Amino acid sequence: RNADFVFNLAGVNRPENPEDFMKGNFGFANTLLDRLKTYNNKAAIMLSSSIQATLAGRFGDSEYGRSKKAGEELFFDYARETGAKVAVYRFPNLMGHSRPNYNSAVSTFCWAVANDEPFTVNDRSTELELLYIDDLVEGMFDLLEGKEVHCEFEGVETVLTETGRYCCVPVTHKVTLGEIVDLLEEFKQQPTTLMMPKMPEG
């Protein structure tokens, strides 16, 4: 009711039924915005969306992406209606502190390699854009201070522009699934080979 800033990081990403994507992501966003309207609270609000909302490339048939896209449009409509500041972030894949075998390929691979557990890589050439969770948090502090970075999207590519209606954390890393697995295997063998894997910059 008296919030000065609202972060909407909630979302459904592994439902039992595909239709629950829309109920959980769009439905909750709608409820949240209605509650703000009820109390005439025009606090700035942030939406955690996904690169899948571009519905481009391999995300073209993503029910999750469609639900996130619907939530985005709801937020943009809310901004036009109320004049409130809205910051919509289309996050790529996240890496960092997270639980394996849930929704982070990097965490799953790290855990599997470290514990000699089997894992599957369907296509080693698949490229991921990764955002480190600590960089995401830093980006949220920047948003609170009015220093957010704006962008638009060309397919799944982020294009920085001061007039963009989206926001982004510009520090990301692009790597293939095969490169991730190979690097993890090199780290695992380091006590035997005594060779430190080559670390990418950044």
Positions of the model-derived regions?
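NAD(P)H-binding glycine-rich loop region in Rossmannoid oxidoreductase-like domains
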Residues: R1-F26, T31, R35-K37, Q52-F59
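Hydrophobic/aromatic beta-strand patches that form the interior of the parallel beta-sheet core
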Residues: F7, M46, A87-Y89, C167-V169
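Mid/C-terminal beta-alpha module of Rossmann-like enzyme folds, strongest
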Residues: D142-G202
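Short-chain dehydrogenase/reductase
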Residues: M22-F26, D61-K69, R99-N103, L130
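Conserved Rossmann-fold NAD(P)-dependent oxidoreductase catalytic core, especially the SDR/UDP-sugar
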Residues: N30-E72, T82, A87
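NAD(P)-dependent short-chain dehydrogenase/reductase
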Residues: F76-V88, P92-L128, I133-G146
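A general structural motif
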Residues: N2-A3, K42-A43, D116
